[in-house]
UniProtKB/Swiss-Prot annotation:
Similarity field: Belongs to the glutamine synthetase family.
Tissue specificity annotation: Abundantly expressed in lens.
SUBUNIT field: Dodecamer. Interacts with BFSP2 and VIM.
Gene3D superfamilies named among the record's database cross-references: Glutamine synthetase, N-terminal domain, Glutamine synthetase/guanido kinase, catalytic domain
Gene name of the record: LGSN
Protein name: Lengsin
Length: 509
């Protein structure tokens, strides 16, 4: 009997005790039908209706009607025939924002669109001890079962850097058809739904730094990797050009790329997009840059000798629900945020300690918060300013479309979906909280009444801040918070810094 049958048999024994084998098979058939219903083929987050009243909610994503599904599949089949595709990757993000996928032969694609692709849950959710589940103790028997990857057809793209292969980003569900409550993408989509229900939409883009190294060479018995690119940005243009062109064909529009602070370090900026697309673009980059680098015998890494790059900056602005007006841009002609923008920023400042736990979730990447400080403290102030790139929250006032806030809490280890979700949750709390009500749109920069929380330098303290932040606990879900905190505590208890560095190098390179 397979794992799914074992799970169903165990549940049926608990509920009824004397269920016959025939009834068990009927239950199995009903469960399979439940998983394969077409509601998971979602396209627009704005048309979802997700309640956050409890963690057992179901995803009510947009249902594709048979004509819509037929039209989508027709275009996909044409693309598969035109490019003579042989394989399709079903990709989902794990906790770190790294792609975990299953690849299927292309001729099975239509079947898998309806039924999904099963994957062991442990591939996405690494648990310290499967028998002592801290993350989802209500349904511990379900934790070690498979999950189902259901494709979002709007993300189907041919991968230019993989031979005759396409990919589709998936949402994750349990075998009983419920959304996986620890899925970062699901959490981000849920927060965007809440934002739209409040009458707003989010325009955002990620800015990433990464390093490109050549093949390691042995000099004087030491293995050394030299930078593959220079400050002049012309040492190996074909690599960056192929990467940017490939990202464009996967739906991720790059606004610019340039050399960064040291040889071999590059910065890449995406064009702002509404909704979940900005996180999808960042997710695509994190996989694509490594695959293109391998073709050139390079190594792409988000780790440099001084620690993780200041990577994963989220530049964002708030717009009305019709996406026509920037709610951050002041009409007074001065470089000031609107009252709405100030309330949003007040929410980010208020929750900055807890946000830092999600956006710098390792010991190594938190060192950059204190890299310029000689005094040893437990925390550092949360800084913000107008057109000041040294601040954690940098308010850029570049005209109506260019007025935005850069959230620089993110590091290379941050999951872009969690960065997006947590930013929206904190900003929404600022909009809705009476504590941050402004006295008036004056020119004073001291616009919030509640002092911003300081950023802990130790991950242990950041975990405490996250556990005590009731707003983020409710927004992201108790199940996810328990899972995230348990995982990080396990890492802190069982790994030294040197071992952690090696783990991250192996994982992220």
């Amino acid at each position: 009997m397979n794992n799914e049958e074992d799970l169903l048999q165990e549940d049926s024994t608990r509920d009824e005790g004397n269920e016959t084998e025939a009834n068990s098979m009927n239950t199995l058939r009903r469960t399979r039908k439940k998983v394969t219903k077409p509601y998971v083929c979602s396209t627009e987050v704005g048309e979802t209706d997700m309640s956050n009243s409890n963690d057992c909610m179901r995803d009510s994503s947009q249902i594709l009607t048979p004509p819509q599904l037929s039209s989508r599949m027709k275009h996909i089949r044409q693309a598969m025939a035109k490019n003579r595709l042989q394989f399709v990757r079903f990709e989902a993000t794990d906790l770190h924002g790294v792609s975990r996928s299953k690849t299927i032969p292309a001729h099975f694609f239509q079947e898998k669109v309806s039924h999904g692709v099963c994957m062991p849950r442990g591939y996405l959710e690494v648990i310290p001890n499967p028998k002592d589940n801290e993350m989802n103790n209500i349904r511990a028997t379900c934790f070690n079962s498979d999950i189902v990857l259901m494709p979002e057809l709007s993300t189907f793209r041919v991968l230019p850097w993989a031979d005759r292969t396409a990919r589709v980003i998936c949402d994750t569900f349990t075998v009983t058809g419920e959304p996986l409550l620890t899925s970062p993408r699901y959490i981000a989509k849920r927060q965007l739904s809440h934002l739209q229900a409040s009458g707003f939409s989010l325009l955002s883009a990620f800015i990433y730094d990464f390093c490109i190294f050549g093949v390691p060479e042995i000099l004087n018995s030491k293995i050394i990797s030299f930078p593959a690119l220079t400050f002049l940005n012309n040492h190996d243009q074909p690599f960056m050009q192929e990467l940017v062109d490939g990202l464009y064909h996967t739906g991720a529009n790059v606004e610019s790329f340039s050399s960064s602070t040291r040889p071999g370090q590059m910065e890449i900026s995406f064009l702002p997009e509404f909704g979940i697309s900005s996180a999808d673009n960042a997710f695509t980059l994190r996989t694509g840059v490594k695959e293109v680098a391998r073709k050139y015998n390079y190594i792409a890494s988000f780790f440099i000798e001084t620690g993780f790059c200041d990577s994963g900056i989220l530049s964002h602005s708030l717009w009305d629900v019709d996406r026509k007006k920037n709610m951050f841009c002041s009409t007074s002609g001065t470089e000031q945020l609107t009252i709405t923008g100030k309330k949003w920023l007040a929410g980010l400042l208020k929750h900055s300690a807890a946000l830092s736990c999600l956006m710098a979730p390792s010991v190594s990447c938190r060192k950059r918060y204190s890299k310029d400080r000689k005094d040893l403290k437990k925390s550092v102030p949360t800084t913000w300013g107008y057109n000041d790139n040294s601040c954690i929250f940098n308010i850029k006032c570049h005209g109506e479309k260019g007025t935005r806030i850069e959230n620089k809490l993110g590091s290379a280890t941050a999951n872009p979906y969690l960065v997006l979700a947590a930013t929206v949750a904190a900003g929404l709390d600022g909009l809705h909280s009476s504590n941050e009500v402004l006295a008036g749109p004056d020119e004073s920069t001291d616009f919030y009444q509640v002092e911003p929380s300081e950023i802990p330098l130790k991950l242990e303290d950041a975990l405490v801040a996250l556990e005590e932040d009731q707003c983020l606990r409710q927004a992201l879900g108790e199940t996810f918070i328990r899972y995230f905190v348990a995982m990080k505590k396990y890492e802190l208890e069982n790994e030294e810094i040197a071992a952690e560095r090696n783990k991250f190098l192996e994982y992220f390179i």
